[in-house]
């Protein structure tokens, strides 16, 4: 294989790898943005169900929502 052919293959591989790096960086940026949106949404849900504090666990939100839905179901039965 000639030296020029090897250089061309290596150059093509470099271009491919740079493209993959850029794609990965774009994907990471999209995922970070999506993560921020989801965090904000969870924070809103937590506030809506009365959970406050610096550290909020998803399990706490789930439990609070379960309790609220159970209370709503009980109230609906009582009204019947």
Swiss-Prot record:
The organism's place on the tree of life at top rank: Viruses
GO biological process: virus tail fiber assembly
Keywords: Chaperone, Viral release from host cell, Viral tail assembly, Viral tail fiber assembly
Pfam families hit by this protein: GP57
UniProt KW Cell inner membrane keyword: no
This protein's record includes keyword Chaperone: yes
InterPro entries associated with the record: Phage_Gp57 (IPR020159)
Reported function: Chaperone essential for folding and oligomerization of both long and short tail fibers. Required for the assembly of gp34, gp36 and gp37 (components of the long tail fiber) and p12 (the subunit of the short tail fiber). Together with gp38, participates in the formation of the distal part of the long fibers.
Oligomeric form and interacting partners: Homotrimer. Homohexamer.
Protein name (record): Tail fiber assembly helper protein
């Amino acid at each position: 294989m000639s030296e020029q052919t090897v250089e061309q293959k290596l150059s093509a591989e470099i271009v491919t790898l740079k493209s993959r790096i850029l794609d990965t960086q774009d994907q990471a940026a999209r995922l970070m943005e999506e993560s921020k949106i989801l965090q904000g949404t969870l924070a809103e849900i937590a506030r809506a169900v009365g959970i406050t504090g610096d550290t909020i666990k998803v399990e706490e939100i789930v439990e609070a929502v379960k309790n609220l839905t159970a209370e709503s179901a009980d109230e609906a039965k009582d009204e019947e």
